[in-house]
Amino acid sequence: MKTTTLLLASVATLALALPAGAADPQLLVFDWAGFEEPGLFASYVEKHGQAPSYSFYGDDDEAFQKVASGFRADVAHPCSQMVSKYRDAGLIEPWDVSRIPEFANIDPEFLASPIFKDDAGVWYIPTDWGATAIAYNPDLVPADDVASLQVFLSPKYKGRTSLPDSSDDVWALAYLATGVTDWTVISEDQFKAAAAWLREAHKNVASYWADPAEMSQIMASGEVLVAWSWNDGVAYLQDDGYPVAFQREATEGSSSWFCGFINLKNGPGSEDKAYDFINSWLRPEAGPALLDAIGYGHTNAAAMALVSLEDRETAGLTEVNAPVLAQTPNDPAMRERQLAEFEQIKAGF
């Protein structure tokens, strides 16, 4: 793992939605803050002499709204459950996978949806994946307390928990906590039970974190003892020597997710350079670079083969003996309902 100070991580978040300077004006990548890692686009730089231009965001729905409102970029990096929104809005076009040699090495499980790949073409190139589970301070939180997701309701941790300001992640938590491990089909009763659980969990929340750097900071400060966290936030804390553990085997389980790149219609830059960029991302050497810099797994099986088991274990990316709710594409109408309900819950309603 790369040693990353919390200060530097927080500085990176200040670049949200701001284009990076001294970069190739012929390719604009709309991406999560922190993904402008040289190891991911090394072959692009070798070919073109400079890195792509970047514009950053911190939330999938925020990014979609910006693109839908007319923001122009060449490629964007949504997580899987957002792809249908971009397709339905007519904002993307298929990739020509004949121009992407490593496409053949992407683990098939990441493409197992007609939303990503159908008779019209390949609409999505999955690239990176991770886990969401319980991060906690083992010096102050007994392991027995985090054996269940109900720790987020415990009066013992009132004002000492944190949840992501991400509708998908909090609903994954709520569904798991109420016995649901597959969110592709959700009944009315399941939705209501999860919403009620979230309202109870909200009472314990000190803050909703916007990005892994923020989550790491509030845990490092001691303000928060238990958080529902992505694995990279845990890696930040580990690298900086703070006491943290990652519980992916709570009785009710944990969640997994993956993200990738879409080819935006009418991009302002070079289509050829968009393919050079995605080919750099998918080359096997990008696997260790991704894990080292950000803590995520790679969808290219050849890339993951270059990552040691020890590094996977440190990153929290090994197999677990517990349920896993995969954040695959779910019903768009239900997702919008969850988003609206989450905003109500955060507001105290």
Task: Give, region by region, the residue ranges found by the protein language model.
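C-terminal capping/gating helix-and-loop segments adjacent to ligand/active sites or protein-protein/ligand interfaces
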Residues: P288-F349
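Periplasmic-binding protein-like
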Residues: F191-A201, D240-K265
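Early extracytoplasmic/lumenal segment of secretory-pathway proteins
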Residues: A23-Y86
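Extracytoplasmic ligand-binding site segments that recognize negatively charged/polar headgroups
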Residues: H77-V83, R87-A206, A210-S216
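A ligand-binding cleft/hinge motif common to bilobed small-molecule-binding domains
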Residues: M82-K85, A220, V226-P243
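Paired acidic/hydrophobic, glycine-rich loop segments that form the ligand-binding mouth/hinge
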Residues: D74-P78, Y208, L225-W230
